[in-house]
Amino acid sequence: MPQLDKFTYFSQFFWLCLFFFTFYIFICNDGDGVLGISRILKLRNQLLSHRGKTIQSKDPNSLEDLLRKGFSTGVSYMYASLFEVSQWCKAVDLLGKRRKITLISCFGEISGSRGMERNILYNISKSSPSNTGRWITCRNCRNDIMLIHAVHGQGSIK
């Protein structure tokens, strides 16, 4: 674009103003322009922040319910995986007995799975909402479950 000089100043200024005012009107219209989208986003952020405050203001029992559901889901997944391992170990053990070779000692899982389930359910019931240190109890519960895994691999659980 050439520099503004005395002869082309008016035409360049005219086209510049026409272009930018058209662009400005397109941006600032009340319909679907960019500012309309920004207003929608501002309203959405206000609603989300308001919703977040209402979620945080609920009683802590709902957090306990979420925690219990999470633990029960974890226990059910763990029990399902133990059941599948049990089936696999039985199949491999049958093949080993048939060939007179013991391939796997089943990791002590047949005797340990029931005791493991009992200990997990006991630890979950121990972390009740009436406990004042519920997060410490859950942390202890997680450590107990890890300890159960270590014992489970070595033999039976008493």
From Swiss-Prot:
Its EC number is 7.1.2.2. Keywords: ATP synthesis, ATP-binding, CF(0), Hydrogen ion transport, Ion transport, Membrane, Mitochondrion, Nucleotide-binding, Translocase, Transmembrane, Transmembrane helix, Transport. It is found in: Mitochondrion membrane. It holds the Pfam family YMF19_C. Changing residue 124 to L: In Ogura, male-sterile line. It is an enzyme of class 7 (translocase). GO terms for biological process: ATP biosynthetic process; proton transmembrane transport. It comes from the Eukaryota. GO terms for cellular component: mitochondrial membrane; proton-transporting ATP synthase complex. The keyword Translocase applies. The chain crosses the membrane at residues 7-27. Its main location: mitochondrion. GO terms for molecular function: ATP binding. It is a single-pass membrane protein. This is one of the chains of the nonenzymatic component (CF(0) subunit) of the mitochondrial ATPase complex. F-type ATPases have 2 components, CF(1) - the catalytic core - and CF(0) - the membrane proton channel. CF(1) has five subunits: alpha(3), beta(3), gamma(1), delta(1), epsilon(1). CF(0) has three main subunits: a, b and c. This is Putative ATP synthase protein YMF19. It comes from Raphanus sativus. The lineage of its organism: Eukaryota, Viridiplantae, Streptophyta, Embryophyta, Tracheophyta.
